[in-house]
Amino acid sequence: MTIQISLTQFLTFKAFVSTNAKYNYILKQKNNDGYHPSHDYWKNFREAIHRLPYNNGDLTVLYDAVDMVKPEKKANYTKSVNNFINFVSDNDVTFFEVGKAKWNFENELVINASPDIGMIIDGKKYFVKVFPNVQQKKSRLDSKSVKSILTLLQETNANFNTSSGTFAVLRVNSPRFFKAEAIKERDSKLLKIDAANFVNCWEAV
């Protein structure tokens, strides 16, 4: 049976250094009953971003997301919302709808990797994956991890015309906008090695 996971799950697995940590993470995922909204910290933030192409880019929906979350989340949500809005304002961004995309590794592993939103910046179209996470040392979204993400995004099977724009990653905290470049053979091979490692660990647990 093909393993189906989210991009976040794959990145979390990759971030663990020790085999023991990877084992425990896979065990937790296999024992999990599946997705539940209460376990999705950034659900309200992402849903607000998804609405932007349909409300003429009205950013007030992001403040609505802050109002909806529990008190213990408000500080992180407020920081991410303010950083996202500052990025949009500084770059005169307009939004458009994007479709779905998945990355398939030898029909053994499928990773859901749909862009969160389409952005037009300086007349250029970008299919953007947004990472609002408050950065911690053990899971920091650095240039190395972003390169792997962008390689995966470019190799996805998408239901929209990917040749009309460029894949990109927006790191919301410690803000930075990463644009995809031509895929390097080495990066593609490293990605497949990580995927094979995930499959092997999954099957061994």
Predicted feature residues:
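A structured, charge-rich N-terminal accessory region that forms the first stable segment of a protein
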Residues: 1-71
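Alpha-helix boundary/N-cap detector
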Residues: 36, 40, 72-75, 144, ...
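Structural alpha-beta junctions
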Residues: 54-56, 152-163, 193, 197-200
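Acidic-basic catalytic patches of nuclease active cores, encompassing PD-(D/E)XK
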Residues: 68-99
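Flexible, glycine/threonine-enriched loop-and-boundary segments that flank and lead into catalytic domains
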Residues: 101-106
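Active-site beta-strand-loop-beta-strand hairpin of nuclease catalytic cores
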Residues: 108-112, 116-128
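Nucleic-acid nuclease catalytic cores
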Residues: 121-182
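Domain-level recognition of nuclease-like catalytic cores that cleave nucleotide substrates
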Residues: 166-205
